[in-house]
Design a protein with these regions (language model features):
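ATP/NTP phosphate-donor binding region
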Residues: 1-90
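A glycine/threonine-rich phosphate-anchoring loop and its flanking beta-alpha core
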Residues: 111-206, 214, 310-314
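Gly/Pro-rich interdomain helix-loop hinge
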Residues: 283-357
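Short, amphipathic C-terminal "tail helix"
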Residues: 354-390
């Protein structure tokens, strides 16, 4: 996507969240809202406020929560049936990447034939409005035309400009109550997006600008973000201004970083840091952001060593400067220091055959955005390092 297309998104909640949402639903005359959100939705600050608003405006809503992390195709199909039965006039997604990706696919597939597998059909635009609100700071799905679902245990990438959300609700309060482990894992996903959009073969001025700003916000705020007390009490009910609650500025900065990193990969798509992470995460049950960080932990120094093979090697120096480093190698070192500081990289229980299973599972097409053409021996070397030399 181009920067112009990305920035056409309409953002709600920049000033007065409640009033902006009220005006939005009234102006569009939405009467039947199909809500895609996890079971914790009613307990979220924005969940309570939306339910109160729906009641005041006489809006009916159906809460679809029948999906798991890393949503399955069959769960999306259940959502399509529920949306059709409810006859909703808008889809509202509230949650992390799984909720948003599920909603995106419900929107996209609803316009397709039920007589053929959805993933095999040609996608097309439809006029179902899609409103999203991310409650984590990592995937950036609120600002990308991508979704990820799984079929028979295999990752399926869905891409179409129709699922780039036209409307985004901005409200960072939910980040405060995330478990510390989830804060770290999602933060690493955002950082991976920003890094990969900078070194991508298709990196351009826009993706680098988005990525640079995202990394700056993360490095400036991540320690304060992780030190915030994990709570969701009356003190944080109602969107406080940064002046009223200085910690709100930290939450908003982290949310902005994840959003900018999402915009960055909307321009370039992801690279080997993601392509090599999916099977790794599946085998060892790792959160997606952590899996990408474990790959990039090996990949970033590898790229510094092999920069003579790289398309646009100057992007590595640009990335290094984002980490306040003067050389490519020093940039990679700074990244590794951040991972060490987070104390989240696990020791994997590697079984015989895992290495070859990982190497065999990589689809070369997913590596097409990477600035170095990775050979099988490169991939094996990287996985061997990721697995701890096993």
């Amino acid at each position: 996507m181009t920067r112009e297309e990305i920035e056409n998104q309409i953002v709600l909640g920049k000033k007065n969240l409640k009033e902006e949402l009220k005006s939005f639903f009234q102006e569009h005359s939405f009467r039947r809202i199909f809500l895609v959100a996890g079971s914790s939705f009613p307990k979220l600050p924005i969940g309570e406020e939306l339910q109160e608003l729906f009641s005041k405006l006489g809006i009916s809503f159906y809460h679809f929560s029948e999906f798991r992390p890393n949503p399955r195709l069959e769960e999306v199909e259940e959502g399509i049936t529920a949306f059709s039965d409810f006859q909703g006039d808008v889809i509202l997604a509230v949650g992390g990447g799984s909720a948003l990706d599920t909603a995106k696919c419900i929107k996209l597939f609803t316009g397709l034939s039920k007589d053929r597998p959805y993933l095999e059909q040609e996608y097309r635009e439809n006029d179902i409005p899609l409103v999203v609100h991310p409650t984590t700071a990592g995937t950036g799905s609120e600002s990308t035309p991508f979704a990820v679902i799984y079929q028979d245990g295999e990752k399926c990438s869905v891409e179409h400009e129709s699922i780039y959300p036209k409307y985004r609700i901005e409200d960072a309060r939910s980040l405060r109550s995330l478990p510390i482990y989830q804060k770290k894992a999602t933060l690493l996903d955002a950082l991976s997006h920003a890094m990969e959009a900078i070194w991508s073969k298709y990196s351009n001025e826009d993706s680098r600008a988005y990525g640079q700003k995202a990394i700056s916000l993360i490095l400036t705020n991540y320690k304060a973000y992780l030190s915030l007390e994990n709570k969701n009490d009356a003190k944080v009910q109602g969107k406080a201004s940064s002046a009223e609650d200085p910690s709100q500025a930290v939450l908003e900065s982290i949310a902005e970083a994840a959003n900018l990193a999402g915009k960055a990969i909307a321009v370039t798509k992801t690279t080997a840091g993601h392509a090599l992470s999916y099977k790794l995460g599946s085998i060892y049950q790792l959160p997606h952001g952590l899996a990408t960080a474990m790959v990039n932990r090996a990949l970033y120094p590898f790229m510094c060593r092999e920069k003579c093979r790289m398309i646009h090697p100057e992007n590595l120096l640009f990335l290094a400067k984002c980490f306040s480093a003067e050389t490519e190698e020093e940039g990679a070192k700074r990244y590794l220091e951040i991972l060490e500081d987070l104390e989240i990289i696990p020791t994997l229980s590697v079984k015989a055959g895992d290495l070859e299973n990982l190497v065999a599972a990589v689809n070369p097409e997913r590596l097409s955005n990477h600035p170095i053409a990775l050979r099988e021996e490169d991939i094996r070397l990287l996985y061997k390092e990721i697995l701890g030399g096993k």
